[in-house]
């Protein structure tokens, strides 16, 4: 079930939290793979989410922050690292994307792997089991220019919402696994 909502819609945020909680509950390990670069305002959504998530919930297993971004040049290496270090983990990919004018500032949960770079005509490997995308600007004839001319304020606020929702879902996941492990003992 895919979800799309304006980032300021509290009902949408609650729906996202409920769906994320449902998706991760049966997995022992959850990895958050935040894709993008802080060198382009529109593409900084992923690294901002990763940074905010690590601040809110330091135990989260996050790849991709402002300090250590995951981008086109290192994506394959990071995906390989995740597969080796976290076999069988459930991976949630986070990235910015371009869309219709009417969809700008929307957050989407898509229940299939992410195709990073598709909006700017890059061919990169699919990543994640599900993905969260923030529609940061409109798509068009010159996608590189559009993603560069995106308001950081909007991206920042969307990243805060995504990170906060992920933190809540992961905290609930940790508590569930702790109780589950106690019952198994």
Regions found by a protein language model. Give the residues of each.
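N-terminal catalytic or cofactor-binding beta/alpha core of small enzyme domains
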Residues: 1-91, 96-185
